[in-house]
Amino acid sequence: TLSLHDALPIFAAALKALRAENISTKVFNSGLGISVFRDNSTRTRFSYASALNLLGLAQQDLDEGKSQIAHGETVRETANMISFCADAIGIRDDMYLGAGNAYMREVGAALDDGYKQGVLPQRPALVNLQCDIDHPTQSMADLAWLREHFGSLENLKGKKIAMTWAYSPSYGKPLSVPQGIIGLMTRFGMDVTLAHPEGYDLIPDVVEVAKNNAKASGGSFRQVTSMEEAFKDADIVYPKSWAPYKVMEERTELLRANDHEGLKALEKQCLAQNAQHKDWHCTEEMMELTRDGEA
C-alpha cells in the first residue's frame, strides 16, 4: 500500500500527463475551492487557483476584513459556514511564529466536529498553502520534480541534497521553506545537509523531526556552517534565504504589538547581520563542487 507521500507525486505526474494530452482532469463537475490568504502571495495564489480549475472547482478568495469575522464571528462559525459551499479550503498563514499552523489545526478541528455533529454534509479538504512551520505545497512540488528528474522515488535514496542559507538583501523571509524541505526529503532515504551561518537556526522541533525521519528511512541528516561543505558532491542544491529563528520570534512579538519603530530597528540589525555573509552565494565556482559539477 502506498503512503500518501508516495502516492501524491505519482498522482501529480498522471495529472500532468493528461493535461499535456489535453485530456480532461476534472474530478468535479461543479463546486468551490476557497482560499484564505492572511499574507501576501503570488505564485501560491495562482498555482492553487490553477489546481482547483484543473480538478473542476471554481476558486473564491475569502477576504476576512470583508466577512463576518471582522464583526466577531468565531473561527468555528466561519469555518463551518463556508464549508457548506466548499470542497476545499486553502489557507496561507505564515506571518506569526507559533500561530499559523495552530490556526489551521483549529479550522481543521472545527470542520471535523461540524461533520461529526451532522452540521456539515461533508468535510472539505484543508490545504496548507504555507504556515509558520511548513510550506507543503511547495516542498511536494519539489519532490514531484525530483521524482521526474531521477526516474522514481526509490531512486532518491542515497541522493545528497544541500538545503543551504543564501544571502539576500532583505530580511524576515519565512522558515517554512527550508523546514519543509528537510522535513520531507528525509522521509525518502536521502542524505540531507542543512547549511547556514551560525545563528541562523530553524525551529528546533522541526530539526528533530528531520533527524528522526532520516533514521527511519535509512537516510541521513546533518547540519554544517559551511556552504562549500554542503555543496561538495551534492546531487541537488537548494539555496534559500531565511531569517534566524530567534529573529522571527522577536519579529512576531513586534508585529503583534504593532511596534513599527521596533520593526525598523530589527530590520536594520538583521540586514547588517545578513551583510556579513554575502559570500553565501550560489556561484559557478560553488556549483563546480557538486557531484560532477552537474547538480
Cite the ranges covered by each PLM segment.
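Charged helix-capping and loop-helix junction motifs
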Residues: E73-E77, L175-G180, L254, K278-C282
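Immediate post-signal peptide segment of exported/extracytoplasmic ligand-binding proteins
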Residues: R19-G31, N155-G158
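Structural alpha-helical scaffold elements that stabilize or flank donor/cofactor-binding regions
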Residues: D6, I82, E229-A230
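A short helix->loop->beta-strand "cap" motif at the edges of active sites that frequently abuts
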Residues: Q117-P124, M190, L289-A295
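Glycine-rich phosphate/diphosphate-binding loop of Rossmann-like nucleotide-binding domains
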Residues: R38-S50, R147-H260
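Glycine-rich phosphate/nucleotide-binding loop
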Residues: K240-A295
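Short, small-residue-biased leader/transition segments that mark boundaries at the very start
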Residues: T1-L8
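Phosphate/diphosphate ligand-binding glycine-rich loop within oxidoreductases
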Residues: K26-V36, N40-R147
